[in-house]
From Swiss-Prot:
One GO MF term attached to the UniProt entry: structural constituent of ribosome
Protein purpose: Binds together with bS18 to 16S ribosomal RNA.
GO terms, biological process: translation
Keyword terms of this UniProt record: Ribonucleoprotein, Ribosomal protein, RNA-binding, rRNA-binding
Cystine connections: none
Protein name: Small ribosomal subunit protein bS6
PANTHER family per the UniProt record, alphabetical: MITOCHONDRIAL 28S RIBOSOMAL PROTEIN S6 (PTHR21011), SMALL RIBOSOMAL SUBUNIT PROTEIN BS6M (PTHR21011:SF1)
Family: Belongs to the bacterial ribosomal protein bS6 family.
Recorded GO CC terms: cytoplasm; ribonucleoprotein complex; ribosome
Pfam families: Ribosomal_S6
HAMAP family referenced in this protein's UniProt entry, alphabetically: Ribosomal_bS6 (MF_00360)
InterPro entries cross-referenced by the UniProt entry: Ribosomal_bS6, Ribosomal_bS6_sf, Ribosomal_S6_plastid/chlpt, Transl_elong_EF1B/ribsomal_bS6
Domain of life: Bacteria
Length: 109
């Protein structure tokens, strides 16, 4: 199964509890379709370069997923319908990176 990097921005109005519920809901969608969640990172509540849907900030999150192309297509279709997700980007990757992402490393400095 191919490896995917799925990065999304959730609404700024979500509490940490609601954001955790959103991530659990997304991961259950994946596992229902036979996909496997390999890694999850929360990058924080960050400012936008421009306003999106009258919002200036959003919760940035990244998930590494091992899934079939058809299950990823279905997952992306359902994420588009979720009003809490403002934007997302799904990239196919060759391998899972070791350690934390650059965003996490930059926040630790």
């Amino acid at each position: 199964m191919p490896l995917y990097e799925f990065t999304f921005i959730a609404q700024q109005g979500l509490t940490q509890y609601e954001l955790e519920g959103l991530v659990k809901g997304l991961s259950s969608l994946l596992t229902k379709n036979g996909a496997e969640l390999l890694k999850y990172e929360y990058w924080g509540l960050l400012d936008f370069a421009y306003t999106i849907d009258k919002m200036n900030k959003g919760h940035y999150c990244m998930i590494y997923i091992k899934a079939t192309p058809s299950s990823m297509d279905e997952f992306k279709r359902k994420v588009r319908l979720n009003e809490d997700v403002l934007r997302f980007l799904c990239l196919k990757k060759d391998k899972l990176p070791k350690g934390d992402s650059l965003m996490i490393q930059a926040n630790q400095v």
